[in-house]
Amino acid sequence: MALLDDDDISTALALLPGWGIEDGMLVKEYVFPEGFMAAIAFVDRVAVAAEDADHHPDIDIRWNRVRIAVVTHDEGGITGKDTGLAAECDRLAVA
């Protein structure tokens, strides 16, 4: 899959509220007011989606906060795989 250029990334970010770029990766922090178990349930849903897509994000869990970072390592940057997984994470956060 081809790397996205800066314009493509800006367009994608406009459709992905709360996502940003950090160290060349798409990054977002989700907060679950319900607490730790809600955060873990979200991570479980993301894990299934990531495995199905064969595209695995970096995940950091801090009690009720989950930080997701995605990048296509094989391509050396952000691709459509990353924006697709970011959108899926947003969908799963409200599931």
Regions found by a protein language model. Name each.
Residues 50-73:
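Mid-chain, well-packed structural core segment of small domains
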Residues 26-33:
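Short, well-ordered beta-strand elements within core beta-sheets of diverse protein domains
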Residues 1-23:
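Short acidic N-proximal helix/loop "leader" segments that mark the beginning
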